[in-house]
């Protein structure tokens, strides 16, 4: 049976992931990980490598087939890399979403998550075009 891990870091993310979680819980082994407490501890530390390290250990132990992440928070690239190096398939929800109100960091972080992801779920046609443009701009991914 397939094992999938949903990772979120705040209540709003959980609300958006909940329909996906409920769908997959019907047919798969599903784990939901709330990293919000870990993130709060690290905000003063600023060492985001600890998130990578923690996820790498957990993913190695649990042997997930997929991880599912949402959005563009600054800790997500570290989670993505842990899964990527363990050959766990990555599902990026809200891929390609760009907003004028987002900080410049968000505009860089989202593609950093989408590129190693195996699946990008876009919420709009504009987002889908952004993801397609991103992949066309990288010669070895064409």
Model region roles, listed by residue range:
Residues 7, 69-70, 93:
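Structural motif
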Residues 88-142:
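Active-site-proximal region of nucleotide-activated glycan assembly enzymes
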Residues 68-86:
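An aromatic- and histidine-rich active-site surface loop
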Residues 2-61:
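Glycosyltransferase specificity loop/lid
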Residues 14-18, 73-79, 128:
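Short glycine/serine/threonine-rich phosphate/pyrophosphate-binding segments
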């Amino acid at each position: 049976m397939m094992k999938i891990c949903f990772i979120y870091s705040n209540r709003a993310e959980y609300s958006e992931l909940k329909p996906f979680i409920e769908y997959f819980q019907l047919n798969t082994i599903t784990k939901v990980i709330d990293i919000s407490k870990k993130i709060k501890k690290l905000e003063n530390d600023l060492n985001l490598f600890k998130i990578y390290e923690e996820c790498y250990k957990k993913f190695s132990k649990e042997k997930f087939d997929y991880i599912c992440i949402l959005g563009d928070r600054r800790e997500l690239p570290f989670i993505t890399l842990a899964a990527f190096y363990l050959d766990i398939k990555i599902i990026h929800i809200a891929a390609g979403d760009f907003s004028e109100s987002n900080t410049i960091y968000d505009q860089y972080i989202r593609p950093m998550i989408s590129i190693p992801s195996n699946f990008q779920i876009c919420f709009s046609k504009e987002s889908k075009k952004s993801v397609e443009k991103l992949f066309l701009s990288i010669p070895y991914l064409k």
